[in-house]
Amino acid sequence: MVSPAAPDLTDDLTDAELAADLAADAGKLLLQVRAEIGFDQPWTLGEAGDRQANSLLLRRLQAERPGDAVLSEEAHDDLARLKSDRVWIIDPLDGTREFSTPGRDDWAVHIALWRRSSNGQPEITDAAVALPARGNVVYRTDTVTSGAAPAGVPGTLRIAVSATRPPAVLHRIRQTLAIQPVSIGSAGAKAMAVIDGYVDAYLHAGGQWEWDSAAPAGVMLAAGMHASRLDGSPLRYNQLDPYLPDLLMCRAEVAPILLGAIADAWR
């Protein structure tokens, strides 16, 4: 088992800076776990990555934001979070299958902070998505831009989808739109492919949990891009049931086109 050094307390960091630091720290640990355990037993590797990254993040959040609640994929869901004004929604290892496969770099670490606002519009205010196997690059709400994405609406829309579970609605909207499906692993890697301009959209309709999309959605919206349910309604977080049935993340200019095609497909 990798035993990371005790982290320095960083109480002076802003929430956005802390999110980025947590994502990078967990990413470094996951790379160490990968190197130490190897790929001979994928289940053992994935379990170790999930568990150790989760322990690191929970330990740091307890030390550095002791009054905040946490919703993690790898921890018991303490429903006291429903009364909290600040909830960290984290996925210590997004894409366990990809993490456990040699040569795959499309896995991520998700860190998001949900805050209850006084105007009745709670939202993800700070978030970071790390792609550890790609140089541990971290996409963060306080610095992200959409500059890498191409301008305008392309003739063919490149849409990131699951390699194993492509959404059925995709086949229906292909009747009216020119679409090129692009298979990418984890949810975070798919969403950041939109930020990087590698794809135009990320569409999912097979069901997810809040930790799968909270950080990617926060980063997307901070970059001026679009993130919603497939019917165009907002993505809601810190709900009693953290299940989210579907989502669309895309460049802002293609959102009306895709939402319209999806609505037509459902009629």
Curated annotation (Swiss-Prot):
- CDD domains of this UniProt entry? CysQ
Q: Which residues bind substrate?
A: 73, 93-96, 212
According to the UniProt record, what class of enzyme is this?
A: hydrolase
Activity-pH dependence: Optimum pH is 8.5-9.5 for PAP phosphatase activity, 9.3 for IMPase activity, and about 10 for FBPase activity. IMPase activity shows a dramatic decrease at low pH. In contrast, IMPase activity is highly stable at alkaline pH, with more than 60% activity remaining at pH 12.
Gene Ontology, cellular component aspect: plasma membrane
Cofactor list: Mg(2+); Mn(2+)
Name its pathway: Sulfur metabolism; sulfate assimilation
Q: Which reaction does it catalyse?
A: adenosine 3',5'-bisphosphate + H2O = AMP + phosphate; beta-D-fructose 1,6-bisphosphate + H2O = beta-D-fructose 6-phosphate + phosphate; a myo-inositol phosphate + H2O = myo-inositol + phosphate
A single GO BP annotation from the record? sulfate assimilation
Q: How does activity depend on temperature?
A: Optimum temperature is 62 degrees Celsius for IMPase activity. After preincubation at 70 degrees Celsius for 2 minutes and then being assayed at 37 degrees Celsius, more than 95% activities of IMPase and FBPase are lost.
- Record bears the keyword Magnesium: yes
Tell me yes or no: is Electron transport among this UniProt entry's keywords.
no
Q: How does it assemble?
A: Homodimer.
Concerning its family, UniProt says:
Belongs to the inositol monophosphatase superfamily.
This protein is called 3'-phosphoadenosine 5'-phosphate phosphatase
Lineage of the species this protein comes from: Bacteria, Bacillati, Actinomycetota, Actinomycetes, Mycobacteriales
- Its encoding gene is what? cysQ
